[in-house]
Amino acid sequence: PNADKVVTNDPMEATYVGMHMWKQAVEKAKTTDVDKVIEAMGGQKFKAPCGFELTMDKTNHHLHKPVMIGEIRGDGQFNVVYKTKGPIRAQPWSPFIAGNESKQKI
């Protein structure tokens, strides 16, 4: 019931993508050995429900994802007012948090 009104959010999509990427890594590694799966994770690609193909960064395992800016509507949903043309590489260490300047640059 009400399936036409159900929407996904970023945490739901992240869980879905994460499970599928883990499955792909296990298949690539041909084992569930943690170290081998971690090694197999980098560089993976997966078509997410948002429509974009996401890539797992080889050096830090963060996802390259699209950036969207939305305007909240009265019904609690969003109108996307800006969307990048494609996924953007993640910056894992915020330059706005003290102490991060000494962390590895990517």
Model regions: which residues?
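Extracytosolic ligand-binding ectodomains
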Residues: 1-106
